Design a protein with these regions (language model features):
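A helix-coil-helix interface module used to build multimeric assemblies
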Residues: 1-202, 207-213, 276-277, 292, ...
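Glycine-rich cofactor/substrate-binding loops
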Residues: 1-37, 98-99, 266, 281-445
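Generic, well-ordered alpha-helical scaffold segments in large soluble proteins
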Residues: 41, 62, 66-69, 91, ...
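Short, well-ordered beta-strand elements within core beta-sheets of diverse protein domains
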Residues: 43-51, 167, 237-245, 369-377
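Short linear loop/turn motifs
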Residues: 58-61, 226-231, 387-391
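Charged, flexible cofactor/metal-binding loops and thiol motifs
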Residues: 118-125, 129-130, 144, 152, ...
Length: 445
């Protein structure tokens, strides 16, 4: 199969195989978005007189048939075809003859893959947003459920001050609310139309870029055609930072869960069917889900650096280096969603231990409570600190285990309603409905 850039000269199969690499495999993830981009592009071409009305009707019908093939998992990129763009054009040409060759007017594979990646990223980010919200809801539910169950708080892995499961679950809920800000920023960058930038320098055709922006439900466009091409690599890196931010939260939570589940802590218990065993030690119940989540999320945190190293120090314009970014960027969404889903499942099924702080080994954790009590009675804080410290050293410290924390965000005043409000406000800023309406209009038969 000759490439679409064929000039009548022999193609070196070795070079072809090396330069195509895994692109065909990665492009299968982009197939439906490539067809959507083509639907918008041909609608625009007809509006400026580069296609006849009947040609638009015929091409649109065939492109929508291709969408059906993709949805049914019956679409393939044939052997010898370089990429999804070439496959779509080939199938249209087979069906409609020379009419199929007209769809590339005013377009390059450079802006074609850009719009594919923007649409793909926008869609996949939506999936991550929904998964994060589902995990957030579980964390808030568990925080409210166990708000009165106390837990040791640690600094330097030394027992420090009283905490609670309400605080622990709620802390990660609020962390996800902040992480959602990064996802919102990443979504906004992916929601700008690059189509019409062609190879990176525009076109002499009178392209109507606002029309394709509207048809694809983009919020705006990358106006400068050179910059539109410069977003390749930059978009992926910035989105990767957003994914890595969520991954960092999950990794930290996973470490806590592994530690709290161990016999030396015993703060939480996982159901037997959520653990794995040992081939030699019959007593083992290992938290492998959290361990694998920690490793996968640490791997995801390296993604921005990996993309940076592939794209750093490139001048403006397109370079083939960008092709390799797809291989690490595209799979990252499913990896993160898998981690979020598994963490949510585990947290829904854990059991927390009651009365942890009744154990005498945690008596010193109430030392600050005693210092504060003395300070409230008029003893200077530093003197109260010394008195309590001395009683701990000489073994005479008797803790008062009543907790009275009432300020915002403390054990007795979790402010979960405010955290929920923060999350809901951020979620309102995602224009999902507007996008759905545009895509449904574009793709409906």
């Amino acid at each position: 199969m000759k490439p679409i850039w064929d000039k009548g000269k022999p193609v070196n199969d070795l070079i072809q195989r090396y330069t195509v690499g895994l692109d065909r495999e990665m492009d299968m993830y982009l197939a439906k978005y490539d067809v959507m981009g083509s639907l918008a592009h041909i609608t625009m071409l007809e509006s400026i007189g580069l296609l006849e009305k009947e040609e638009l009707v015929a091409l649109s019908a065939e492109l929508k048939n291709l969408l059906d093939l993709i949805e049914e998992d019956n679409f393939v990129i044939e052997d010898g075809v370089e990429d999804v763009h070439s496959q779509v054009e080939l199938m249209l040409t087979r069906k409609l003859g020379d009419m199929g060759k007209k769809i590339h007017s005013g377009r390059s594979r450079n802006d074609q893959v850009l719009v594919d990646l923007k649409l793909f990223t926008r869609d996949k980010l939506r999936g991550v947003v929904n998964s994060v919200k589902a995990l957030f809801d579980i964390l808030i539910k568990q925080s409210n459920r166990y708000k009165d169950v106390l837990l040791p708080g640690y600094t330097h892995l030394q027992i420090a001050m009283p905490s609670s499961f309400g605080l622990w679950f709620g802390a990660y809920a609020e962390a996800l609310a902040d992480d959602m800000l990064f996802l919102r920023a990443a979504f906004e960058q992916s929601n700008r139309n690059p189509l019409g930038s062609a190879a990176g320098y525009g076109s002499s055709f009178p392209l109507n870029r606002q029309l394709t922006t509207n048809l694809l439900g983009f919020e705006s466009m990358n106006y400068n055609v050179v910059y539109a091409q410069m977003t390749r690599g930059k978009l992926e890196r910035n989105v990767a930072y957003a994914l890595a931010t969520v991954a960092a939260t999950l990794s930290r939570l996973a470490f806590d869960a592994c530690m709290y589940n161990s016999q030396n802590f015993g703060f939480i218990k996982l159901p037997d069917d959520c653990t794995t065993g040992s081939s030699i030690m019959p007593h083992k119940k290992n938290p492998d889900v959290f361990e694998l989540t920690r490793a996968k999320c640490n791997r995801l945190q390296a993604l921005p650096q990996e993309i940076t190293l592939m794209t750093n120090n490139l001048p403006s314009g397109y370079f083939r280096d960008m092709q390799l970014v797809k291989e690490v960027f595209i799979p990252a969404f499913d990896m993160l969603e898998d981690c979020i889903t598994m963490v949510a499942y585990m947290l829904e099924h854990i059991t927390v231990k009651e009365d942890i702080l009744s154990d005498s080994k945690y008596d010193a954790i109430f030392s600050v409570e005693e210092v504060n009590r003395l300070a409230l009675e008029g003893v200077p804080f530093r003197e109260a600190y010394k008195q309590v410290g001395a009683s701990i050293e000489n073994g005479t410290f008797v803790p008062n285990k009543e907790i009275n924390h009432t300020h915002q965000g403390s054990i007795g005043n979790l402010c979960n309603d405010m955290i929920v409000s923060k999350m809901e406000q951020i979620l309102k800023e995602f224009p999902f409905e507007t996008i759905d309406e545009a895509i449904n209009r574009l793709t409906s038969k």
